[in-house]
């Protein structure tokens, strides 16, 4: 058994206990995050800015709207693989820190079979959730249409809402019950999507509570940290106009994006980033470690 509260606070605990080692994550995550921004600007920056400006005018013109969406397709083609790599390395590092702490390497960061398996798990889980959502959404639509034909629009709306809530509950159940797939795959050294389902039997509500509490803590921490960053930007930049340039930057080019204030903000945001990430990522391996203590799961 595990404590939902302990799991929810595991990110804070790991951050405190491994503070010095995690300092190495600051420049690494900072460089990776900056690289993501550069990719966005290089591959789709001008197009995204143009799309923002043209969106109201193209709403009634499907051809123009489709043309405006081209930058998004180019962006996804680059960002999705990059995010898989980024989070594959990140999740493997957190799992290594919590489940194999003696294997420090470069502050637990590496790139090898463990990271590739994490990427595979993300892809497979993403496909699973997409298929379940797609099939469920089609079923809800058919049910609502059949109800409308048989009993009228009012009843169909009610049935559609209830069926939609049931689909949402199914997706949440899947997400919670399969949430240990990453940790289990790392610990066993083989891709295992559904072993988590058996492992979490009887623990759904404590796990859901732990994840919800961790999410609330993460939101509070993010608000506190970025309120401080906003205050610094306003103070140094001389007013709210500086903050506007930071939170709504001009992505037309690298030169227009990386202004002095944006660079200052990015550098400051690098510092808390690893510790904020731990709040959301650590609960799952913490729960896995507790549930498998003394076993070979």
Regions found by a protein language model. Give the residues of each.
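Nonpolar helix-loop interface/hinge motif
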Residues: 1-49, 167-238, 265, 297
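Alpha-helical transmembrane spans of integral membrane proteins, capturing the lipid-embedded, hydrophobic core
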Residues: 22, 26-34, 80, 84-85, ...
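Selective recognition of hydrophobic, aromatic-rich stretches within alpha-helical transmembrane segments
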Residues: 34, 38, 68-103, 154-190, ...
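Membrane-helix interface motif
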Residues: 38-57, 134-148, 227-244
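Short, membrane-exposed interhelical loops at transmembrane-helix boundaries
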Residues: 60-67, 198, 240-264
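Membrane-interfacial helix-loop-helix connectors in multipass membrane proteins
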Residues: 144-163, 236-252
């Amino acid at each position: 058994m595990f404590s939902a509260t302990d799991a929810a606070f595991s990110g804070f605990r790991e951050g405190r206990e491994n503070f010095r080692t995690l300092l190495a994550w600051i420049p690494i995550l900072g460089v990776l995050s900056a690289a993501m921004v550069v990719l966005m600007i290089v591959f789709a920056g001008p197009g995204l800015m143009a799309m923002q400006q043209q969106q109201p005018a193209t709403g009634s013109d499907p051809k123009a709207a489709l043309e405006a969406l081209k930058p998004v397709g180019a962006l996804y083609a680059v960002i999705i693989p990059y995010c898989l790599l980024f989070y594959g390395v990140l999740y493997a590092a957190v799992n290594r820190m919590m489940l194999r702490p003696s294997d420090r390497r470069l502050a637990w960061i590496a790139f090898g079979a463990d990271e590739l398996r994490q990427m595979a798990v993300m892809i497979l889980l993403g496909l699973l959730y997409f298929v379940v959502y797609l099939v469920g959404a089609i079923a809800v639509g058919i049910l609502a249409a059949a109800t409308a034909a048989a009993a009228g629009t009012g009843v169909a709306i009610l049935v559609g809402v209830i069926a939609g809530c049931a689909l949402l509950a199914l997706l949440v159940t899947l997400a919670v019950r399969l949430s240990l797939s990453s940790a289990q795959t790392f610990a066993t050294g083989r891709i295992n999507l559904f072993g988590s389902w058996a492992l979490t039997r009887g623990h759904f509500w404590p796990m859901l509570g732990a994840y919800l509490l961790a999410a609330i803590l993460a939101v509070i921490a993010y608000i506190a940290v970025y309120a401080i960053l906003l205050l610094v930007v306003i103070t140094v930049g001389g007013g709210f106009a500086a903050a506007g340039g930071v939170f709504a930057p001009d992505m037309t080019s690298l030169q227009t994006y990386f202004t002095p204030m944006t660079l200052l903000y990015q550098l400051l945001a690098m510092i808390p980033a690893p510790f904020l990430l731990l709040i959301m990522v650590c609960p799952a391996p913490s729960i896995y470690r507790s549930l498998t203590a003394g076993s070979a799961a």
